[in-house]
């Protein structure tokens, strides 16, 4: 049986992305340079959250190429205990606003909202009922 290991997204500014994901509670774990034929091609930055190790990999390619998000990409979903507090912290630290205000889904009190990370990847924040 397979186990989930990590999600990788390409980034354009390692420091900006690191600061953003740390504001969401991720911990920087390690970085790994990818060198081929003596040329530094990419640096992978790994992040952990809670007791889950190295679940997010941010890849910076050193050749300066740009990327377009594919049409098949949806979003990364993250659970938060305090949706309003998380949004306030992201606004203060990064000027990030949700796509629309948080809203309730279903009848159980769960609230969600969507936002974009510094490289325009869509992030869903989920506050389950009861915090």
Residue ranges and their predicted role:
Residues 47, 115, 125-128:
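GNAT/GCN5-related N-acetyltransferase fold signature
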Residues 12-15, 52-53, 65-122:
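Vicinal oxygen chelate
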Residues 2, 8-53:
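Core segments of cupin and vicinal oxygen chelate
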Residues 11, 62, 127-129:
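Short beta-strand segments enriched in hydrophobic/aromatic residues
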Residues 34, 64-65:
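Short, P/G- and charge-enriched loop/turn segments at secondary-structure junctions
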Residues 27-37, 101-105, 126-130:
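Conserved catalytic-core motifs of GNAT/GCN5-like acyltransferases
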Residues 6, 124:
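Short catalytic micro-motifs in class I SAM-dependent methyltransferases
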